[in-house]
């Protein structure tokens, strides 16, 4: 007869949790993350101050920036942090709402799991609800004329009012709109707006925020290579290279055996002739400026200076691409292949200015720039970083509207309208699925509720009146005024959000809730003791099954 010995399948230093315990653990982790972020929603949002491991300070109310800095251990919480990053990369805004919404979706599901309802039932109800949420959103959305700059500024302003930069909202809105319109590129009827690549934000501490501006061109943190080169050139002809103007060394180690003294002189002479040839290839096109990503030797500088050409070396590849887009030049790999149409003539001015202790090269007044630089000034690095984050959000909002010119009302109005539509629809449903379906409508109310809480108004009274308002005809644009905590019509207040952001928020929130409800087992592998000593403070790796 076999003895009743336990059979060990998993290695002894792994920890396994399964069933209800895991689901409630996941839900609590998601709720905890949502609670951290909750106070960062709306115009009356609070800021968070975070210290990173290196001792740097981050002050922000941007959901994604906060979660990026927090070190999270629980695997479910990690996936919550991940969705805020996805939201930021996809649409650039709504990072706070998506976390709060996902947390609330899981929170309302907990009640059904306690009543022994199977997660699959809850999931299929959530999926149905998501389809209806999307169709309702599209119904209440309105088209927008993207050439109406007042309306565009209004939309960007709705995004900026919740940020630290709201004091300078008109300046920030104009900067964002100008920058996005500048980098907009249409080809064969296809719009391309690449903010990350072509709209660079340069932060220079000093001055005041009002000094910030958009440059019609590019600014790089470089000086000329030779002190006698020109520093102010009008209508410059610009040549861009990604090769070095130095003597080419052999790819692998090269040995040369010399027997006579003249041979040594000849080798040096060949080096000089090679560099002279490179420079002559460039000089024959009569450029005013040569910009290269690699080095320029002293001899090459001498030849270029004699030809009255300004040279700038070791420019970043990304900056070189921006200069090419701004002045219409083409980046060339070999100077001997340079042709007239590779020369950029679109820039109006090249000048070198000293700001603080550093020299900056400005290539501005471009005729038709498809790249720009946003110059930010401000009191300290922390403030500048926060302003940059806010501006990135504003530019993303602008980009979303240009690519998909559909708007939905902000201030929690869309959420209430969608919640009302779901509640009405659930009345016609039968079977057990109607309860989780109705719970989604309840979860959506978390956005207006949080807005009311953050301005310190009475939550229950206002939410009840808002619910009542949405049962009336043509009242789907009523929401919460985040400044005063009163109910207003968003049409009159002018608070609009791009449809693309809202759709992405709902999809991501529901998908995350569904993903976390599906998990019923977590197996975490613990580190070996010796490993733990050497890397103390590191979170244990947790795998999900």
Swiss-Prot record:
| Protein keywords | Acetylation, ATP-binding, Chaperone, Cytoplasm, Disulfide bond, Hydrolase, Isopeptide bond, Magnesium, Metal-binding, Nucleotide-binding, Phosphoprotein, Ubl conjugation
Q: Where ADP is bound, by residue?
A: 42, 94-97, 162-163, 411, 482-483, 497, 502
Presence of keyword tRNA-binding: no
- Gene3D superfamilies in the record, alphabetically? GroEL (3.50.7.10), GroEL-like equatorial domain (1.10.560.10), TCP-1-like chaperonin intermediate domain (3.30.260.10)
Q: Crosslink Glycyl lysine isopeptide (Lys-Gly) (interchain with G-Cter in SUMO2) sits at which residues?
A: 15, 248-249, 381
Q: Where in the cell is it found?
A: Cytoplasm
Task: Report the record's disulfide bonds.
Answer: 366-372
**What organism is recorded for this protein?**
Pongo abelii
Q: What class of enzyme is it?
A: hydrolase
Q: Which residues carry this modification: Phosphoserine?
A: 11, 170, 243-244, 252
Q: Which family does it belong to?
A: Belongs to the TCP-1 chaperonin family.
Give the modified residues of type Phosphotyrosine. Answer: 247
The record's listing under SUPFAM superfamilies reads: GroEL apical domain-like, GroEL equatorial domain-like, GroEL-intermediate domain like
Residues the record lists as N-acetylmethionine modifications: 1
* Region described as Disordered: spans on this chain: 1-24, 526-545
Tell me which EC number(s) this protein carries.
3.6.1.-
The UniProt entry's coiled-coil ranges are: none
What name does the UniProt record give this protein? T-complex protein 1 subunit gamma
| Oligomer and partners | Component of the chaperonin-containing T-complex (TRiC), a hexadecamer composed of two identical back-to-back stacked rings enclosing a protein folding chamber. Each ring is made up of eight different subunits: TCP1/CCT1, CCT2, CCT3, CCT4, CCT5, CCT6A/CCT6, CCT7, CCT8. Interacts with PACRG. Interacts with DNAAF4. Interacts with DLEC1.
Instruction: Give binding positions for Mg(2+).
Output: 93
Q: Name one GO cellular component term.
A: chaperonin-containing T-complex
Q: Which residues carry this modification: N6-acetyllysine?
A: 222
GO biological process terms held by the UniProt record: positive regulation of telomere maintenance via telomerase; protein stabilization
Keyword check for Metal-binding, yes or no.
yes
């Amino acid at each position: 007869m076999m003895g009743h010995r336990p059979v060990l399948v998993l290695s002894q230093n792994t920890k396994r949790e399964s069933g209800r315990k895991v689901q409630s653990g996941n839900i609590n982790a998601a709720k905890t993350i949502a609670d951290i972020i909750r106070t960062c929603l709306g115009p009356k949002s609070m800021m968070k101050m975070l210290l990173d491991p290196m001792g740097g300070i981050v002050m922000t109310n941007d959901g994604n920036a906060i979660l990026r800095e927090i070190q999270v251990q629980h695997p479910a919480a990690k996936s919550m942090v991940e969705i805020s990053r996805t939201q930021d990369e996809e649409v650039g805004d709504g990072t706070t709402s998506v976390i709060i919404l996902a947390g609330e979706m899981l929170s309302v599901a907990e009640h059904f799991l306690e009543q022994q309802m199977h997660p699959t039932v809850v999931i299929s109800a959530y999926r149905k609800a998501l389809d209806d949420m999307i169709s309702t959103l599209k119904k209440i959305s309105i088209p927008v004329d993207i050439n109406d700059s007042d309306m565009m500024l209004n939309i960007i302003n709705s995004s900026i009012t919740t940020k630290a930069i709201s004091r300078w909202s008109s300046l920030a809105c104009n900067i964002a709109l100008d920058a996005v319109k500048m980098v907009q590129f249409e080809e064969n009827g296809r719009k391309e707006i690449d903010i990350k690549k072509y709209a660079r934000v340069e932060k220079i501490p000093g001055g005041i925020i009002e000094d910030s501006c958009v440059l019609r061109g590019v600014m790089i943190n470089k000086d000329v290579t030779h002190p006698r080169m020109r520093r102010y050139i009008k209508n410059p002809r610009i040549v861009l290279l990604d090769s070095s103007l130095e003597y080419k060394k052999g790819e692998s180690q090269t040995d040369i055996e010399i027997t006579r003294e003249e041979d040594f002189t000849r080798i040096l002479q060949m080096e000089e002739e090679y560099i002279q040839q490179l420079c002559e290839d460039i000089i024959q096109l009569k450029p005013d400026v040569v910009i290269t990503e690699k080095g320029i030797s002293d001899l090459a500088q001498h030849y270029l200076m004699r030809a009255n050409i300004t040279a700038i070396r070791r420019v970043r590849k990304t900056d070189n691409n921006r200069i090419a887009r701004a002045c219409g030049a083409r980046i060339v790999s070999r100077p001997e292949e340079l042709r007239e149409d590779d020369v950029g003539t679109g820039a109006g001015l090249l000048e070198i200015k000293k700001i603080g202790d550093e020299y900056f090269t400005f290539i501005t007044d471009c005729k038709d720039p498809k790249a720009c630089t946003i110059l930010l000034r401000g009191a300290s690095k922390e403030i500048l970083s926060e302003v940059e984050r806010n501006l990135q959000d504003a530019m993303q909002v602008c980009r979303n509207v240009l690519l998909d010119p559909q708007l939905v009302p902000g201030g929690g109005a869309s959420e209430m309208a969608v919640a009302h539509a779901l509640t009405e629809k659930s009345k016609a449903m039968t079977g057990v699925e109607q309860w989780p379906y109705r719970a989604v409508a309840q979860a959506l109310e978390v956005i207006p509720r949080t807005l009311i809480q953050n301005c310190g108004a009475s939550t229950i009274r206002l939410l009840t009146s808002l619910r009542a308002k949405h049962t009336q005809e043509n009242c789907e644009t009523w929401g919460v005024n985040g400044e005063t905590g009163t109910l207003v019509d968003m049409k009159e207040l002018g608070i609009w959000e791009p449809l693309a952001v809202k759709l992405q928020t709902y999809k991501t929130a529901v998908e995350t809730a569904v993903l976390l409800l599906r998990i019923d087992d977590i197996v975490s592998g613990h580190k070996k003791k010796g490993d733990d000593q050497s890397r103390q403070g590191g979170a244990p790796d947790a795998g999900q099954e």
